């Protein structure tokens, strides 16, 4: 079994994202996004890629507002400069940005934040919540669909 490696550094990931978007046909609306760090990288490129017309908006599933266990190291500076729509779907109990912590951040449109009930970083709820992971994933899909339809309207 192979050893788990950390992800590439941000400059490598940013360039990879740019390359992939550059290969996508522009005859249809393009949305970028990702889970956790992938969503963060997409959000960091959103202004650049939307101003060039390459993408319409972004989606983040479980945004890492701060490193695990380090709530004072907030990663929101670039979010304050957004010009294109961005939807962040976040579990209420996400250890990298729970509802209580994130409610104190100064997040404004065009950023939209939607909470996944009792969800952790992967949207998994506790059993006692009465929700299931499937319910939360279905909700995330529904919210993402509504967001994309609104952007395209």
Residue ranges and their predicted role:
Residues 95-101:
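Conserved alpha/beta-hydrolase "acid-adjacent" motif
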Residues 81-83, 88-90, 94:
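Short beta-strand/loop motif that positions the catalytic acidic residue
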């Amino acid at each position: 079994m192979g050893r788990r490696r950390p992800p590439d550094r941000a400059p490598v990931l940013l360039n990879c994202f740019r390359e992939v978007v550059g290969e996508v046909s522009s005859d249809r609306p393009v949305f970028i996004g990702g889970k956790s760090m992938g969503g963060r990288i997409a959000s960091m490129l959103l202004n650049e890629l939307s101003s060039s017309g390459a993408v319409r908006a972004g989606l983040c599933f479980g945004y890492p507002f701060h490193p695990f266990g380090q709530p004072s190291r907030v990663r929101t500076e670039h979010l304050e400069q957004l010009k294109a729509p961005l939807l962040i779907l976040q579990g209420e109990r996400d250890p990298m940005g729970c509802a209580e912590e994130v409610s104190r951040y100064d997040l404004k449109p065009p950023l939209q934040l939607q909470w996944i009930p009792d969800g952790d970083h992967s949207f998994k709820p506790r059993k006692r919540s009465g929700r299931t992971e499937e319910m939360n994933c279905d909700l995330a899909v529904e919210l993402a669909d509504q967001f994309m339809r609104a952007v395209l309207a």
